[in-house]
Design a protein with these regions (language model features):
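Conserved DHp (HisKA) dimerization/phosphotransfer helix of two-component histidine kinases, i.e.
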Residues: 1-34
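Conserved micro-motifs of the catalytic ATP-binding
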Residues: 11-14, 51-54, 132
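Conserved catalytic submotifs in the C-terminal HATPase_c
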Residues: 40-50, 92
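Short beta-strand/loop element within the Bergerat-fold HATPase_c
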Residues: 81-95
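Short conserved segment of the HATPase_c
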Residues: 103-105, 117-128
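Short alpha-helical Gxxx[C/S/T] motif in the catalytic ATP-binding
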Residues: 140, 144
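Detector for a conserved hydrophobic position within an alpha-helical segment of the HATPase_c
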Residues: 148-149
Length: 179
């Protein structure tokens, strides 16, 4: 089906041990070039996070889709100087993703102070063809969710006017136990 093909291939990720902050820094450099100083980009990283077994390019795409949406939402505001996007990493202990309990996960947060996601869209934003912008394709977050799922991860969103947080959870442990 066409939508499935647009969401990306179903091939397995090309996994390698990768520093998650390298992924976030690549996204940050791309967004800073696009924003041209119109927003503040804040980095709040936990330096103790070990390398993860991930597909670096896929994770860059997943995070870039979220951060680019935040930039576009902030650009729609009248006063661009107040726009702020934060990239934050932390570790969490004993966290369940799906039916699997993980001893340790990395939590990446993309936080912005934009207008928020309308309540009527919040339950469906990860579905294909759902967009909050008239010119949006509605594929970015569906692709992001697909990539995170391929990495046995979880993505969540919490939003209200002035504060939107996308949280990505990726397992750090390879020996998780079903719960």
């Amino acid at each position: 089906n066409l939508v499935d093909r647009m969401l990306g291939s179903n091939k397995l990720p090309s996994l390698a041990m990768t520093n998650i902050h390298e992924v976030l820094e690549r996204v940050a450099s791309l967004i800073e070039a696009e924003a041209q100083g119109s927003i503040t980009l804040v980095r709040d990283y936990d330096p103790s996070i070990p390398d993860l077994l991930i597909d670096r390019e896929q994770l860059i795409q997943a995070v870039l889709n979220i951060v680019r949406n935040a930039l576009q939402a902030l650009s729609a505001q009248s006063d661009l100087r107040l726009g702020r996007i934060s990239l934050r990493t932390r570790t969490l202990r004993q966290f369940t993703i799906g039916h699997t309990r993980h001893r340790l996960v990395v939590k990446m947060e993309i936080i912005d102070n934009g207008p928020g996601i309308p309540p009527e869209l919040q339950e469906t934003i990860f579905y294909p063809m759902v967009s909050g912008r008239p010119d949006g394709t509605g594929l970015g977050l569906a692709i992001t969710q697909n990539i995170i799922s391929q990495h046995q991860g979880l993505i969540e969103c919490e939003s209200h006017p002035g504060h939107t947080v996308f949280s990505i959870f990726l397992p750090l442990d390879q020996g998780a136990t079903p719960s």
